[in-house]
């Protein structure tokens, strides 16, 4: 609203008999705690067949206030074992790539399209991706990154 419109609105309220206006301060949200709560809420997901053989639900990890969010395809064997994203060979490569551009894993948030490991590291099926996309949408909404880097064809095709 422009100043003139605000002034007119306040005049209207005064004429209407309203004498006091109370404005609540914006609510501060701890994004890290919110993401932990969402992970806790979804970690026992059974929305697709991937849950049947998973060891761990790999929600995502990193800086909840990151300007850069990195999204991959899905967890591999190492990730499934540890419950963290990008910790295997591809994670080591990602760490080196980030270092080359003067970033660390603590500067970014990393997630995947699917949160459970597809068998034999196959590409996630459409219904598996559909089951996990609401979780990823929530992560993106909480983090509100300035930039999203999609790693690989599955991530790019799914999100574009």
Segment roles from a protein language model:
Residues 1-4:
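Short, small/acidic-rich helices and loops at N termini and domain boundaries
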Residues 8-160:
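A polyanion-binding, active-site-adjacent surface
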């Amino acid at each position: 609203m422009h100043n003139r419109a605000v002034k007119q609105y306040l005049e209207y309220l005064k004429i209407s008999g309203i004498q006091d206006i109370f404005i609540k301060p914006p609510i501060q949200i701890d994004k890290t705690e919110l993401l932990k709560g969402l992970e806790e809420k979804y970690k026992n997901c059974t929305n697709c067949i991937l849950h049947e053989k998973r060891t761990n639900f790999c929600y995502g990890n990193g800086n909840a206030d990151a300007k850069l969010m990195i999204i991959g395809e899905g967890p591999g064997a190492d990730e499934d074992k540890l419950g963290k994203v990008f910790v295997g060979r591809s994670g080591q490569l990602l760490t080196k790539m980030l270092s080359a551009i003067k970033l660390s894993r603590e500067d970014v948030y990393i997630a995947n399209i699917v949160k459970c490991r597809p068998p034999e590291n196959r590409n996630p099926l459409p219904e598996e991706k559909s089951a996990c996309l609401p979780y990823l949408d929530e992560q993106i909404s909480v983090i509100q990154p300035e930039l999203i880097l999609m790693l690989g064809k599955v991530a790019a095709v799914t999100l574009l």
